[in-house]
Amino acid sequence: MYAVVKSGGKQYRVRQGDELLVERLAGEVGDRVELPVSLRAEEGVLDLEPRTARAEILEHLRGEKLKVYKYKPKKGYRRKKGHRQALTRIRVVEV
């Protein structure tokens, strides 16, 4: 059985026991969170009823650094900026 859950404006296909990285979730390590399920499938039968999946927060971390660089030619205008996305690693406990 698998389900499609929503988190941080994205959708993820998960099974029970899966670990995944999602955008930062509120809560402490060890807390359980509920994620809305948009689709659930079991043995080829689709279930579209609104449900929730439960997941456990394993750790909070930051993604790899992205460098953004912009410039205007012939004018000496240069800007460099970095960004690291805040992420949370979760384990799906129940679908």
Swiss-Prot record:
It comes from the Bacteria. One of its GO terms (molecular function) is rRNA binding. Keywords: Ribonucleoprotein, Ribosomal protein, RNA-binding, rRNA-binding. GO terms for cellular component: cytoplasm; ribonucleoprotein complex; ribosome. GO terms for biological process: translation. This protein binds to 23S rRNA in the presence of protein L20. HAMAP family: Ribosomal_bL21. PANTHER family: 50S RIBOSOMAL PROTEIN L21, LARGE RIBOSOMAL SUBUNIT PROTEIN BL21M. Belongs to the bacterial ribosomal protein bL21 family. Part of the 50S ribosomal subunit. Contacts protein L20. This is Large ribosomal subunit protein bL21. It comes from Rubrobacter xylanophilus (strain DSM 9941 / JCM 11954 / NBRC 16129 / PRD-1).
